[in-house]
Each structure stands twice: as C-alpha cells, then as structure tokens.
Amino acid sequence: MINLRKTHPLMKIINHSFIDLPAPSNISAWWNFGSLLGICLVIQILTGLFLAMHYTSDTLTAFSSVAHICRDVNYGWLIRNLHANGASMFFMCLFLHVGRGIYYGSYLYKETWNIGVILLLTVMATAFVGYVLPWGQMSFWGATVITNLLSAIPYIGTTLAEWIWGGFAVDKATLTRFFAFHFILPFIIMALVIVHLLFLHETGSNNPSGINPDSDKIPFHPYYTIKDALGLMFLLLVLLSLALFSPDSLGDPDNFSPANPLNTPPHIKPEWYFLFAYAILRSIPNKLGGVLALLASILILLIIPFLHTANQRSMMFRPVSQTLFWILTANLITLTWIGGQPVEQPFIIIGQLASILYFTLLLVLMPLAGMFENYMLEAQR
C-alpha cells in the first residue's frame, strides 16, 4: 500500500520536516524553543487578526477602539491580553533561542544563523510598530523618540524621519502606516521562518556536544513531537497565567492615558524586551553614536561565527567560555534593568560600564577564551 504521507507532493514536505526528520538523539530542552517560537507566531497572528477586525488606525479613535475591544467585544479583553503578553513570551523564547545558539555553537550553521538574525530584527520592528497602535502616552512618545533617531543620520536624516512620519511629526499618517506594517510583517516573518527551516534541514540540527550526530539519529515523531508538546504546555501555562492574573504587569501605566503631544511623560521607555538595546543607546552622549551602538548591539550577532576560535564547537566542555557566557547573560539583565531607570547617577555610569562590557565580551574576551582553551588542551597532550 502506498503511504500518502511519503508520496503526496505537499505532505511529503511536511513529512520530511516534522515527522520522518532524522534528529540527534541527545538534544535537550534548549532545542524546544524553535517550536515554541512557531507556536507564539501562530498565536500572535490569530489574536492579531481578531484585534484588527475591531481596531481603527486613526488618532481620534485608536485609543477608544482598544478600550471598546476590551469592554464590548466578546472575549476582546482575553484576545488583547493574549496578544500583548504573547509578545513578551515571544521575546522570552527568542532570547533563550539565541542564547542556546551562542552557547552550543549553532551559529556555525552560518546561513541558518544569518536568517535567524534577520528574523530577530524583523520581529523587533514588528513589536515596535505594534506598540504604537494603542495610541497611549508611551505609544506616542516611544514612537517619537525612536523614529526621531533617524534624524541623526548625516545629510538625509531629517528627510528620512519626515518620510517615515508622513509629516513633520508623529501623527495620523504615522499611525496608519504603522498599522499597515504591523499587519504585513508577521507574514514576512512566516516566510523567513520557512527559509530558516529550509537552511536548518540542509545541515540537520546541532546538539549539546557539538559533535557530528549522524551516527546516532532518531525520527522527529514521536520522540520530539511529544517533547515539544510538553514545552507547549509550559508556554501556555505561563502565557495564560500572565494574561489572566496580571495582564498589565509588563506594560507601562502611562499607556492607559490617551496620547497627548503637549505633555511629555517624565520617563520615556520602551517595552521590557527592548530595554537592553535602549540602555546601550542612552549610554552614549552623542546622538549618532548612540544610534550606531544600538544597531551594533544586534548586528554584532552576524559576526559571531567569524569570531569562533575554539577547536570545539559547543561550550559544553569549555569552562572559561561558559563563565564568560553567564557573565554576558548577567550583563544583559543589568542592561535591561538600567534601561528602565531614569537618566541619573549611578544608573548612567552602570549603563556605560555594562555597554562596554557587552561589546568587550563578544568581540574580545570570548574569542580569547577560545584560543586559551585550545592552548590548555594542547598543553595537556
């Protein structure tokens, strides 16, 4: 009997990607985040679609349309809370996924890694334009501050900023186009995810040891489908707990006030998942320098594969690199904390030191640690 799963043109692709895919037998729970990110994306697209049915992208009605969704639409409050907190879960999984890639040397699959970095940037852009849509105080001022950074670009900056705004300031035209961007970008993300998986399946998954796993592979289904289902249960538990018990704990109280261009909030800050980059931006007194540092903080991921000096792929057996990795993690948490603090001492100096350490770790210390570990292994022979 012909197995349709293995012969049908469309089902064959799904079969080779999610069912009969040969996977390393030793991949740990750190490999769950890819599937969780896929689920987060589906949740965000579905909840976003239902929100878009009731939302109006006009400065006069945007804020009240969000209030209308929460008050009058059937389960609108739940859809909105799932969408807002789903973004936080998305970024939590993203950061853990990228961290896993750095720790276990997955960045040596260069094509997969580069598409992943482009995905990270696209998701960040989507989240930024999405945060503007409720048209609260922090939405408006966040959009004003961040888009205004474009004016720091020499010669074309001011023209570029006004072109993005569709006027001389953030206004109705900006909100309308941001809604259009926020609607289309998730579908672009979906296309990039397919390319990401395409490149991944060219090489196969990495594994914790960093050793070629071809000699010992198992089918993805049922082993890893069950494992991913467990991860999904945890994700839904956390997401539903957030959305149902404390839906506003990760938001900003200022966003409960409608946007007022005449009243600046005392402390403008983005959502928590941008705070590390925002802290790096603020740590440089020069506007253009800050913008370049902000870009570099993300784009530095693209050069990580070229800074790999160790003979071993994974950090599993490299204690010096492990120590530096966890210092980097602590440093990013520190930057996230600093990004949410007012611009005053001692936060300024802490932010500057943490920013310097961030770049020093990735560009200097980690490559040196790899070389040192090579030397120590050679010395043992």
Swiss-Prot record:
Its cofactor is heme b. The keyword Repressor does not apply. GO terms for cellular component: mitochondrial inner membrane; respiratory chain complex III. Heme b b566 binds at H97, H196. It is found in: Mitochondrion inner membrane. Heme 1 (or BL or b562) is low-potential and absorbs at about 562 nm, and heme 2 (or BH or b566) is high-potential and absorbs at about 566 nm. This is Cytochrome b. It comes from Sminthopsis gilberti. The lineage of its organism: Eukaryota, Metazoa, Chordata, Craniata, Vertebrata.
